[in-house]
């Protein structure tokens, strides 16, 4: 994205991580604007949009990738846990897209939502993840329908098992609880899922960049699965 745009606005809760990513963006010659905000808070999305327009005057692309929903058994999830997961990943993305819609219309811009493969193969231990991701895919479709009229392109990505810091942390907690080493746990999932390896964040980033590029302008209302072949259904 930093290769394709002259400026990139970054919004997340972790200020340190934001600054690290902003430093990398800057090395490409692109101007970064890091905003330490919690997008689960109602007012945060308007702050992002207002600050972006004040600084750069336009919004060409919006990538909704914030949010992690807890992987807790279906019968152990509380209402508060459900609400917290939905508030950031689903409603945070919904609010940000609505607040930025007028600017996206003016720029004939693009929006991408990140869902997840749990929505296509729900399990009891991933019920909240699956439900939230399914809602995101449906939300993206609804925005895409409006986008046809308004000139805004909207799609979603359904990634599978990507080796992120969050996944490593999960494996470090999951492994001892199941009497195995982290190495064994890390190896176990791809074998059980029928995939050759974990995905890398850079691979998802390349797909994101393509979906907001001129090459993909006729793509809208589409959900693209990138999971190494984990989901076998048609």
Where are the regions that the model predicts?
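Short, small/polar-rich loop/turn modules that mediate ligand/substrate recognition or access, typified
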Residues: 63, 148, 153, 219-221
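A conserved structural motif in NAD(P)-dependent oxidoreductases
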Residues: 180-181, 193-204
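Short C-terminal tail/terminal secondary-structure segment
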Residues: 121, 209, 215, 220-234
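Conserved glycine-rich Rossmann-like NAD(P)H-binding loop of the short-chain dehydrogenase/reductase
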Residues: 5-20
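Alpha-helical segment proximal to the catalytic Tyr-Lys
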Residues: 102, 145-146, 217
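Catalytic loop of short-chain dehydrogenase/reductase
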Residues: 110-136, 140-149, 161-162
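Substrate-binding pocket helix/loop in short-chain dehydrogenase/reductase
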Residues: 73-75, 81-86, 189
